[in-house]
Curated annotation (Swiss-Prot):
Function: Required for H(+) efflux immediately after light irradiation to form a rapid H(+) concentration gradient across the thylakoid membranes. Together with PxcL, contributes to transient H(+) uptake following dark to light transition. Involved in light-induced Na(+)-dependent proton extrusion. Also seems to be involved in CO(2) transport.
Phenotype of the disrupted gene, per the record: Loss of light-induced proton extrusion, grows poorly at low pH or in low Na(+) medium. Relaxed light-induced H(+) extrusion activity. H(+) influx activity is also partially diminished. The double mutant missing both PxcA and PxcL is impaired for light-induced H(+) extrusion and later exhibits lower H(+) uptake activity. The double mutant missing both PxcA and FlpA has both reduced light-induced H(+) extrusion and later lower H(+) uptake activity.
Magnesium found in the keyword field: no
Molecular function per GO: proton transmembrane transporter activity
NCBIfam families in alphabetical order: PRK02507.1-1
Principal localisation: membrane
InterPro entries xrefs: CemA
GO CC annotation terms, alphabetical: plasma membrane
Record keywords: Cell inner membrane, Cell membrane, Hydrogen ion transport, Ion transport, Membrane, Transmembrane, Transmembrane helix, Transport
Name the UniProt record assigns to this protein: Proton extrusion protein PxcA
Similarity comment: family membership: Belongs to the CemA family.
Amino acid sequence: MDLTNWWQGATQWFGRSSQKSLEQAFRSALKIKEIEDQYFQGKKIGPENCDYSADTVTYFANQIQRHLRKIEQEIYHLNSDQEFVKILSLDPAVKQDPQTEYVLNQLQFIDDILQRYDGELPQVSPPKQIANGGVLDLPAITANKQRQINKKRRDGFQYIRREDTQQKVDTATQKSGVLPRSFLRTIDRLKREMDPQSSDTEQKVLKQYRNSRYKTALSIKFVLTLIIVPLLAHQLTKTFFLLPSVESFFERNSEVVFINQSMETEAYEELSHFEESLRFRELLGFGEKLSPEAKEEKLAEKAKEISESYRRVSTNAIANIFADIFSLVAFSLVLVNSQREIEVLKEFIDEIVYGLSDSAKAFLIILFTDMFVGFHSPHGWEVILASIARHFGLPENQDFNFLFIATFPVILDTVFKYWIFRYLNSISPSAVATYRNMNE
């Protein structure tokens, strides 16, 4: 197999498995660069490069940290693809391919952003005081650990790096001067406010706000569409097409009442209970004494009522099976035709999740794990399985229920723990530490 064929196969593989991670990391790096250009004059995010308040700088620092974590996660996925590493170590002649050059340029841009914040991540909160008068600098510890992880991950692939002569980190001694920096920042702010071009900055802020509002509205609209469209498909197909067809079948076959033996047993028990209640009331003198013919007539009326009731249950169960199939088709069509909305929704969810504090993340993880795989979860699973069986008209099988409850929550718990160990530990180590402390 020659080098050209190998390169074509590797490129196709890369396009399927790694290009998505690279594109997401590149987009996050572009967002960091956009924030720097719009609000920090193209410099590193920090209070020394702007005249904003501490709360505003904290907001931007939170945004930068969220994008950096996203980049680190995607780079971790790239490093796990050995074929991707091989592509980057090909012969220089192969690297002249336009697609390869485009990939290398993206990696170069991402690496520049990571190097810029590798020395010191933006601090979003001051050190916390502890009881003995010491200082517990958790953000600095987390940043140190994260920098070590970043270095190990970037060692997985090598590519050409240019010298970053435009971005230089100034030390505190280099920044010091005759006038205080706060006074200089005030002068810069006044100059910027008096600048005739300051309206451009206002337009950029307004545009960013409109984009955020549009993203929120589109995400909520898409979620509602995912819920409403399948429900409408289910109800419309069931009411206007399926129920009339199934009812006509039962009318033509009047002897068919039950679709499983469990329904038949329940109907017999209900009729027996009615007969015993008649005899009980008769013995206590609560009603007139019925003749055998009258009692048989009442039992016949009750049997007819019970048969009609269970026939409706059987009709709905059969119609539900086909209606759910139509709902699944409608749901799939919405997903296939809404790729852009899916990307926006993913970004919206990422912003919400990354915006939560570590305590909130740990609380949600504990809530969901205890709800679905916790000590009291078997009772909830029993209710869910019984509801599904009634929905489709299936007989309730206790053996299957016990087997499901004994295996599925265990598998789900394993998946949760693997996700926490594999992904959450690399994205937010402090959230994992908080989760462990709260769980204990």
